[in-house]
Structures are given as structure tokens and as C-alpha cells.
Design a protein with these regions (language model features):
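Beta-strand-loop-alpha "switch" segments that mediate conformational coupling across diverse proteins
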Residues: 146-151
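Short, glycine-/small-residue-rich phosphate/pyrophosphate-handling segment
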Residues: 101-145
Length: 181
């Protein structure tokens, strides 16, 4: 299992909820805030394709592709995914353009989960972001297996969202049961 943390804040509510979801599960986790993933100019239609970029994207993507289950964890920033997460996903265009990577083939059939935490009625207002992830996963042939939306804004407020905690625990149980098979 691979976890992509998109928050710019260490030990925030999104991380806390995600950690509850994966407690006791063997995972590889990356924190995008600790890596450099530059935005790029869209060169999908240029004859030469994208220009090489000296950052961590390729290494992070290669690590992601080694796993069958991936969790995308992002705070709800202005009703969308974090900038760190958006840069990472936007760069998939570069991976799709380079046919030698076989990116879409490697993404096909992967099981995807999403964790989103935010304030201002996120159980409703994060739903467009859930739909966005669904469309992204559909495009690359991955299977959207589920999501958890947490309602929290201040430090450690996620502990007050019983519904999100319960759902995270249910996924944790599911992951543990599937590891035993």
C-alpha cells in the first residue's frame, strides 16, 4: 500500500485521519511537502513532448507504480486538493505522453482511496473533489474503492468527527483482513 500525503502541514488533521486508516498496515508513505514537484508547461502536443524537469516527480511516480493500492490524502484547500497534490497529479500528463513509461497500463486496476479533511461543511463541499478523483482514476483505468471525508479545521479537531473516525477504522479493518488472505 502506498500513501501520498498532500498536506503542507506536518501532523495535521488529514495525516491523523490517514494514519488511523492505515494503522498496523504495511505501507510506504510519501509526504509531498518534503519533495520538489514543479509545475510544468503543457507540451503534450509538441513534437518533442515535455522537456526534462530536474525534480522528484519521476522517482515518486516510480515508487507509486510499485504498489497495487494507493491512498491520496489531501486537505480540502479552497474546495479542491492541495497545491502539492495538484502538481503531482498534473504531472501525470507528462507520464502519459512518454509512451516508454507505460503509465496508463501500470495504473490500470490499481485500487484507489481518498482521504480529505477540511472545514466549512466538507461532507458536502468536498464531494466535487471526490468526483474529480473518480474521473482521474477512471481515466487511467484504476478502481476507486472509497473515501473518507473528515470535518476538522483546528489542530487535532479530527478527533471530534466520530463518523470519519468510524469509517477510517472500517477501512483499517478491511485492509487488515485483506492482508491475511
Amino acid at each position: 500500500m502506498f500513501v501520498i500525503h498532500g498536506s503542507s502541514r506536518q501532523n495535521g488533521n488529514t495525516e491523523a485521519l490517514t494514519h488511523m486508516m492505515i494503522e498496523g498496515i504495511e505501507t510506504e508513505q510519501i509526504y509531498l511537502r518534503d519533495h520538489t514537484v514543479y509545475p510544468i508547461t503543457d507540451q503534450r502536443h509538441d513534437a518533442e513532448g515535455f522537456q526534462p524537469v530536474n525534480d522528484d516527480y519521476k522517482q515518486l511516480t516510480n515508487r507509486m507504480l510499485e504498489h497495487d493500492t494507493i491512498i491520496f490524502a489531501t486537505p480540502l484547500y479552497w474546495y479542491g486538493m492541495s497545491g502539492h497534490m495538484k502538481n503531482f497529479v498534473d504531472r501525470w500528463s507528462q507520464s502519459l505522453r512518454d509512451t516508454s513509461l507505460h503509465f496508463k497500463e501500470k495504473m490500470k486496476g490499481k485500487k484507489m482511496y481518498v482521504v480529505i479533511v477540511g472545514g466549512d461543511n466538507p461532507k458536502l463541499k468536498a464531494l466535487p473533489l471526490i468526483a474529480q478523483f473518480q474521473y482521474i482514476f477512471d481515466f487511467v483505468g484504476s478502481s476507486f474503492e472509497g473515501y473518507v471525508i473528515g470535518d476538522a479545521n483546528g489542530l487535532d479537531e479530527i478527533k471530534n468527527d466520530a463518523e470519519a473516525l468510524t469509517k477510517a477504522q472500517l477501512y483499517n479493518d478491511k485492509f487488515k483482513n485483506s492482508e491475511q488472505k
